[in-house]
Amino acid sequence: MSTPIAIDINKILKLLPHRYPFLLVDRVLEISPRESITALKNVTMNEPFFQGHFPGFPMMPGVLIIEALAQTAALLTFSDERAEDAIYYFAGIDGARFKKPVLPGDQLIMTAKLERDRAGIYKFAVQATADGEIAAEANITCAVRTKGA
């Protein structure tokens, strides 16, 4: 087992192609390459999606929680470096469950565990928590391909 390391926002910006408002990972707290990752997203009232989801009771959309988890998984895949022409596709989801709303002011803690890696196809068990409670969990499949291929 390797020594866990952290990744700051500057390295995240080098590893992921996403940018505001779609970059949904603020920091990697711990990563054990090829094994698991724990990251966080500070959810603020300034998030653009809160304007319409939902007026009077803002909550983070479940699909964006899943996207944040997929970005977290991508960081596990690209923890060393990402080839300039590599793109990370979200390919599938199984068993998604949403158990707690994520609200402004929450700190979303996201974990991804690599379950399988075969021919550029990755399977992960992912989970997001807020205030120590499970907000969402799923099994996701992602693929790394060359842009335009």
From Swiss-Prot:
EC numbers: 4.2.1.59
Top-rank taxon: Bacteria
Alphabetically ordered keywords of this record: Cytoplasm, Lipid A biosynthesis, Lipid biosynthesis, Lipid metabolism, Lyase
Name the UniProt record assigns to this protein: 3-hydroxyacyl-[acyl-carrier-protein] dehydratase FabZ
PANTHER family: 3-HYDROXYACYL-[ACYL-CARRIER-PROTEIN] DEHYDRATASE
GO cellular component annotations of the record: cytoplasm; membrane
Homology family: Belongs to the thioester dehydratase family. FabZ subfamily.
Subcellular location: Cytoplasm
A single MF term (Gene Ontology): (3R)-hydroxyacyl-[acyl-carrier-protein] dehydratase activity
One of the GO biological process terms: lipid A biosynthetic process
EC category: lyase
Catalytic activity of the protein: a (3R)-hydroxyacyl-[ACP] = a (2E)-enoyl-[ACP] + H2O
Active site as annotated: H53
Function field: Involved in unsaturated fatty acids biosynthesis. Catalyzes the dehydration of short chain beta-hydroxyacyl-ACPs and long chain saturated and unsaturated beta-hydroxyacyl-ACPs.
Gene3D superfamilies assigned: Hotdog Thioesterase
